[in-house]
């Protein structure tokens, strides 16, 4: 596969935001991971990250084979997923666009990263490994992410029902951010994307 990382670069605002969130060490890991993804996939930037939860692998059954795959744990700061149903795998897909913007159909392709597993805070490694993939994806150009999880706490719901999250409180006492003690999470959840998912 050719080395197609020449176009890989973060704009000043993205670099500043990533640096503010990750600190110097996390920024270095994120950039290194983004370069690894670009080298392994031959794609300098990706558009979307999808992180699958337990039992969600079948959600992509209708997608074609990925253009490239690598182990999540090969990326700096990312650990081998240990939760049941999670895999140590990151896939790169090319997906045709077919959405409307300003009333007109937009063509082209999406470059999509799909993580088939993740690290959870309850595993005891602290927040760094939990957010490492998200930071790497941001450094790789990703501007939107879809996080999928199993909600076993909702006993009245059926398997496969979809719920979108619009806000949350961090009650863990743990934070991956360098900076303010309280981070307002309302802007994290995208209302337009939630609408597209059918909430």
Regions found by a protein language model. Give the residues of each.
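Active-site rim beta-loop-alpha module in soluble metabolic enzymes
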Residues: 187-199
